Amino acid sequence: MNFFRTILFIIILNIPGFAQDYLPSMDYSAMMNIRYYENNGGFLIETVPIFFPPEDMSSVEFEVATSSGETKFKKNVYVNKWQQFPIVDGIRPQGSGNIKLKQAGDFVLRVNVAGKEITRIPFKMSVQNSGDPFNPQSTYTKEGPWSKLGYISVNPERAEDPITFNWWGRIGELPNGKGGMMTVQIMRSGKEVAVSKGSFISKKSWQSASRKLKQSGSNSRNNFTLADLTQNDGTYEVVLKAGDKTIRTYIATVSGGKLQHHPRSAMDYSPHADYITPKVIYNGSGSASNNKMMDAYWVETK
């Protein structure tokens, strides 16, 4: 199946002008998952997938800038060609991808092509000092889309697999302000239809988490699949909890028997820099040869 899909991609991409019909876009989840260091307000940019890469990759660059436009980091990229995905390349900064901001303020993390941003993650940085003159320490925290967005991921080649919910959490959201478990519930008309096991949250800054869903009640051993979710039209609540405390609630919509994508995932969404890719590249092993392209249905807090 994967072989024939790859051949089809190659045939399509050899149609003159096909690749240029779509603007380049970064894997939004991978951008949000760029490694972050609380002790110095720093990032470590490693390989990030780019969809519909431009023909001239020399014009692609990573940048971190202030909201006023002052550049703090800017580098061109190395390109890793992924043969299993002709419409996707992996890119990483040339040289070190290490950035140490060490300052509060409003910033944007973005990728530019020929000087024009194609994907951006705006964020606000704040600093908390320990207040201990004998052990002076600072912790830098960032605020941005991590508190508002999550996504349901589905393997399009395995309809029998459970759906997975992916989100970002931090210990400040937990009842005791320390490390602990977060779980996911899916509710319809006030009734729980699916639930997950817990995911341990241990970081002060935003930590990515994901959990597969099981059916609730007497069918709790059964996977909760995309077909289960879409058998009834309506509004669903994806509830993130820590014990009995509701952390936040995301809204998902099923219409016409299909799970609806976020408005920002429309291919013609404008401004394009705020477009959210409805596909994500998943890798559970660390080897690029094991990358999988998953469907991503992004949801937002109500």
Where are these regions (language model features)?
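Initiator methionine at the very start of the polypeptide chain
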Residues: M1, A19-Q20
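Sec-dependent N-terminal signal peptides
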Residues: F3-P16
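Contiguous segments within soluble domain cores/interaction surfaces
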Residues: Q20-N112, E117-F123, P133-K302
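Alpha-helical membrane-associated segments of multi-pass integral membrane proteins
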Residues: S126-S130
